[in-house]
């Protein structure tokens, strides 16, 4: 491995948003170096700060030392194991104590029928380039969404010359589908991986879906569907127009390039945060986020009480005065 003196110093990290930076690494060895992490690859050693790093994505061909993982955890950095270009999400390791505030907001919106419907309508509205008319029912919006999707397929079929006979694939016989359907399915898996990574990294649950339900990745499907018409559909049709060979591999490459150029990961993060704003849910600062070592609160009928406190006196039945909520 090259000496540290020849290292590049990665001072500027890409960000989901202000305060949460991320780094994607593949075909490299990650070690603890000089108070941060060192990334050894074919180009040499790159030093990356840890204090400002929110998420480290480890792609194919990556190894990481125990010392590096420990340092990342101590600094509150999430480590995620993903596929090439974040095409799939495999596992994660959470650094230090993380706030559950965003998950709570998602869960409250999911459990309240009125808020649930509002989030569903927001998700549908985000798919359209023009504002939807006021007063539409959910059934009417679903109908408009179906028309939008069919129009997207028809448009790219015309522009690329690739015949389109409808969305069709057989889970038991992958090769039975035509090339463009295989490209769409392979590309969708890529998009799901990216959405999964964004959701988990920001502290939301992939299981609590609003439009989609019943699956552990329901919310992943909700979010990925926002970007299919802009990214997946054109990439699939263009890939097949170039050649019908190896469309699965080539569409993933095309999607990766389009996603990087369009900074889609950052856009996903902003869309996720905006989705739950303005719902009348508490917006106050979360003390756990400010101090990750601070104990969480304890549930109580009157609200939350302070955690990390020994309640109860020396005598049976004697209780210490509980601190104010």
From Swiss-Prot:
It holds the Pfam family Cas_Cas1. It is an enzyme of class 3 (hydrolase). InterPro entries: Cas1, Cas1_I-E, CRISPR-assoc_Cas1, CRISPR-assoc_Cas1_C, CRISPR-assoc_Cas1_ECOLI, CRISPR-assoc_Cas1_N. The keyword Cell division does not apply. Keywords: Antiviral defense, DNA-binding, Endonuclease, Hydrolase, Magnesium, Manganese, Metal-binding, Nuclease, Plasmid. One of its GO terms (molecular function) is DNA endonuclease activity. It comes from the Bacteria. Its EC number is 3.1.-.-. Residues 283-325 are annotated as: Disordered. Its cofactor is Mg(2+); Mn(2+). Mn(2+) binds at residues 145, 212, 225. One of its GO terms (biological process) is maintenance of CRISPR repeat elements. Residues 315-325 have a biased composition (Acidic residues). The keyword Magnesium applies. CRISPR (clustered regularly interspaced short palindromic repeat), is an adaptive immune system that provides protection against mobile genetic elements (viruses, transposable elements and conjugative plasmids). CRISPR clusters contain spacers, sequences complementary to antecedent mobile elements, and target invading nucleic acids. CRISPR clusters are transcribed and processed into CRISPR RNA (crRNA). Acts as a dsDNA endonuclease. Involved in the integration of spacer DNA into the CRISPR cassette. Homodimer, forms a heterotetramer with a Cas2 homodimer. Belongs to the CRISPR-associated endonuclease Cas1 family. This is CRISPR-associated endonuclease Cas1 2. It comes from Thermus thermophilus (strain ATCC 27634 / DSM 579 / HB8).
């Amino acid at each position: 491995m090259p000496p540290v003196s020849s290292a590049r110093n990665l001072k500027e990290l890409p960000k989901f948003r202000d305060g949460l930076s991320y780094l994607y690494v593949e075909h490299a060895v990650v070690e603890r170096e000089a108070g941060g992490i060192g990334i050894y690859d074919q180009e040499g050693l790159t030093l990356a700060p840890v204090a400002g790093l929110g998420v480290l994505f480890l792609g194919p061909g990556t190894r990481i030392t125990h010392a590096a993982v420990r340092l990342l955890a101590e600094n509150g950095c999430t480590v995620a194991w993903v596929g090439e270009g974040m095409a799939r999400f495999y596992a994660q390791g959470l650094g230090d104590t993380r706030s559950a505030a965003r998950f709570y907001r998602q869960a409250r919106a999911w459990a309240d029928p009125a808020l649930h419907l509002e989030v569903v309508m927001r998700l549908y509205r985000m798919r359209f380039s023009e504002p939807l008319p006021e007063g539409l029912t959910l059934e009417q919006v679903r109908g408009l969404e179906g028309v939008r999707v069919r129009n997207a397929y028809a448009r790219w079929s015309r522009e690329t010359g690739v015949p389109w006979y409808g969305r069709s694939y057989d889970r038991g016989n992958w090769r039975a589908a035509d090339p463009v359907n295989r490209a769409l399915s392979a590309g969708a898996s890529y998009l799901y991986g990216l959405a999964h990574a964004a959701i988990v990294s920001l502290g939301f649950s992939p299981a609590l879906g609003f439009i989609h339900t019943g699956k552990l990745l329901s919310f992943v499907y909700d979010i990925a569907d926002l970007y299919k018409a802009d990214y997946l559909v054109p990439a699939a049709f263009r890939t097949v127009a170039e050649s019908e060979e190896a469309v699965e591999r080539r569409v993933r490459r095309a999607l990766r390039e389009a996603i990087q150029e369009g900074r889609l990961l950052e856009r996903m993060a902003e869309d996720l945060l905006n989705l739950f704003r303005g719902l009348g849910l508490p917006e106050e600062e979360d003390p756990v986020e400010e101090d990750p070592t601070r104990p969480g609160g304890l549930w109580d009928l009157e609200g939350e009480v302070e955690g990390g406190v020994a309640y109860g006196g020396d005598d049976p039945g004697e209780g210490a005065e509980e601190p104010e909520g």
